[in-house]
Amino acid sequence: MIKGYCDDRFLKIKNIFSNQINNGYELGCSVAVEYKGKEVINLYGGYTDESKTNLWKKNTLVNVWSVTKAVTGVCIAKLISENKLDVNNKVSYYWPEYDC
């Protein structure tokens, strides 16, 4: 079962997302997209475990592996170009809990 929000303009993405879970290509997952500063997709569904006893929830935490390095790099470059991120600052400047 897929939950969340999807703007009608992006229903094709919702259908692809649903098919991935319903056809067993993904056990569980989530996707969120902002377009022109507004949330247009925030979907989640499936399970967090192979025994299918724990549903994927809106706030399910997941590890971010190597597949996201390119996207993360582009986001960081954009923040630097907008003077919203200074590479000379420590991580704890932006994320105080990291300094614990």
Named regions from a protein language model:
Residues 2, 9-22:
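Short, basic/aromatic recognition patches
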Residues 5, 9, 63-68:
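Extracytoplasmic/periplasmic, Sec-exported soluble proteins
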Residues 14, 18, 77, 91-92:
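Non-transmembrane alpha-helical segments in soluble domains
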Residues 18-55, 87-89:
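A short, well-structured edge-of-sheet supersecondary motif
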Residues 21, 80-81:
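Alpha-helix C-terminal capping/helix-coil junction sites
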Residues 58, 63-67, 81-100:
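Active-site helix/loop module of the DD-peptidase/beta-lactamase fold
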Residues 70-75:
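Short amphipathic alpha-helical face segments that pack within enzyme cores
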